[in-house]
Amino acid sequence: MLPPALNIPKWLEANSHLLQPPVNNYCVYHPSSPATSGYTVMIVGGPNARTDYHINSTPEFFYQYRGSMLLRTVDRSVSPPAFQDIPIHEGSLFLLPANTPHCPVRFADTVGVVMEVPRAPDATDTMLWFCPNSACKQVVWEKRFVCTDLGTQVKEVVEEFSADLAKRTCAACGTVAESRYKEGELTQPPRFPPE
């Protein structure tokens, strides 16, 4: 028998305490479940001010349930890489193409749903940090791994980067990259898109 549909408001009422930093997500449909056919569906809350970019070998589907978020992306097919911020407003959908470096920035009192399609068993995910010096923007550090548990593995990589000054120091210009955005460094997009 199939499970009932997930009621997001009721789920949040009972489980919002599960959306804790640094990842702020909870996997409501896990890829190991026979019912999901390998799909991952997460509810993600804010705030989440991590500065890392994630590369997933498959597309990711974003639905912004409450409030607005900022999806920071990088096009590495051009030189220098092109950085683009994509606001995802309340009630909006966005499909991120596979292999696109992205940094989902979530603000306080926001909730979104992210769905990831099944990865190949040997597919590697990448987490990377770019130099915050606007004249440089080189990759400061990156780590590749086979993703078996997004919530725990992402947290471990973020903590590894945060704890090591050498990993956070840009080899090209010497600027130190932080693992979190500073308060007020980014502006939250409006809740709804401008008319």
From Swiss-Prot:
State the source organism's domain of life: Eukaryota
Tell me where it resides.
Cytoplasm
Give the CC-aspect GO terms. cytoplasm
Catalyzes what?
Answer: 3-hydroxyanthranilate + O2 = (2Z,4Z)-2-amino-3-carboxymuconate 6-semialdehyde
Q: Which residues bind a divalent metal cation?
A: 131, 136, 170, 173
Look up the EC number in the record and give it: 1.13.11.6
Alphabetized, the UniProt keywords read: Cytoplasm, Dioxygenase, Iron, Metal-binding, Oxidoreductase, Pyridine nucleotide biosynthesis
One function term, GO molecular function aspect = ferrous iron binding
Could you say which residues bind substrate here? 60, 106, 116
Which residues take part in binding O2? 50
Give the matching InterPro entries.
3hydroanth_dOase, RmlC-like_jellyroll, RmlC_Cupin_sf
Tell me the route in metabolism or biology where this protein functions.
Answer: Cofactor biosynthesis; NAD(+) biosynthesis; quinolinate from L-kynurenine: step 3/3
Q: Which NCBIfam families match?
A: anthran_nbaC (TIGR03037)
Which protein family is it in?
Belongs to the 3-HAO family.
**What biological function has been recorded for the protein in this entry?**
Catalyzes the oxidative ring opening of 3-hydroxyanthranilate to 2-amino-3-carboxymuconate semialdehyde, which spontaneously cyclizes to quinolinate.
Protein known as = 3-hydroxyanthranilate 3,4-dioxygenase
- Give the organism's phylogenetic lineage: Eukaryota, Fungi, Dikarya, Ascomycota, Pezizomycotina
